[in-house]
Amino acid sequence: VLSTFAKVSLNEDAKIFRDTYNWIVRYVHGMKGNTLLDIAQQLIDNKEKKDYFISAMRKADFNISNISIDNEARMHSGKDVFFTHHTIDGSDFTLSSIDQSLGTLRYFQLQECIFNMLREDHIYSFDEIESNLHYDLLLHFLTTFMMNTANSQILFTTQDQQLLDEEFIRRDMVWFTEKSKEDASTELYCASEFGLHKNLSLYKAYKTGKLGAKPELGSIF
């Protein structure tokens, strides 16, 4: 219904649909998000946002002191966004986005979510949120979200089993998917449905196969 609404012009009787559609467009965000160049341009235009990003990247031990765009370099070499790194001895060096690690770029882009959720209630979704991130950085991102936002939500898939062992991960937050052998359909179920004792490790229960959602691997020989 909402996808159709975006393509047609309706009268004032459809105000409830218009309001719902506008809310989703503004506050619900898919997995791709803005490009690196889009974010960098926003930082140049918004000092508050730029200061937040630089502070967040420093807290994450990236030592980034500035972000800039070189339009001339972009035209000639494809290098557009540049990161200035500050070293202990006081010297600085600059790397283009092409030369940055995927982990640095991934964490940089994730900061847009936190910045927005600190100011308004948003919903973000990610597929394999841990992609290219050191586990400690993933935890830093998730705990920053948990401790500093009010009514925002993050929906994400992950292959990282270690998260099941974290104290801030409640059982009603965790959902598993298991593929049927018969028809290849996928069943979705919540960890809280198992009624496990509160002292039983969710991580260990999953590792030992009590919760399903594990591939049945054949012999390596």
Residue ranges of predicted features:
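Short, surface-exposed secondary-structure junctions/capping segments
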Residues: V1-D19, Q111-N116, L202-F221
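Electropositive, glycine-dotted interaction segments
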Residues: V1-E72
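Generic hydrophobic alpha-helical scaffold/packing signal
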Residues: I54, S101, Q111-I114, E130, ...
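N-terminal accessory segments
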Residues: A56-I67, T87, K207-K210, E216-F221
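Conserved RecA-like P-loop NTPase ATPase core
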Residues: M57, Q100, D127, T157, ...
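Conserved ABC ATPase signature
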Residues: E72-F115, E120-I123, I129-L133
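C-terminal lobe/lid and adjacent interdomain/linker elements of RecA-like ASCE P-loop ATPase modules
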Residues: A73, H140-F221
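Short alpha-helix of the ABC ATPase nucleotide-binding domain corresponding to the H-loop/switch region
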Residues: H134-L139
